[in-house]
Amino acid sequence: MAERPLDVIHRSLDKDVLVLLKRGGEFRGKLIGYDIHLNVVLAGADYIQDGEVVKSYGKIVVRGDNVLAISPVDIE
């Protein structure tokens, strides 16, 4: 059976993810929540633009309308 997108996101709970935004920039942080609209809650999130951290947040909700992609981040 094919893997569903929300299954991938669910397996990423409590792990670091990269959230790419439609208008450029990205958030990187620990995924602590999400819903079917791809609204995501990140803890310890950094907003990154052009490879540089612009601002750090303790906890932030990113509205699903702004999300282009969500990717698990493997930290070794």
UniProtKB/Swiss-Prot annotation:
The keyword Ribonucleoprotein applies. GO terms for cellular component: ribonucleoprotein complex. InterPro entries: LSM_dom_sf, Sm, Sm_dom_euk/arc, snRNP_Sm-like_arc. Keywords: Ribonucleoprotein. The keyword Aminoacyl-tRNA synthetase does not apply. GO terms for molecular function: RNA binding. Residues 4-76 form the Sm domain. HAMAP family: Lsm_RuxX. Belongs to the snRNP Sm proteins family. This is Putative snRNP Sm-like protein.
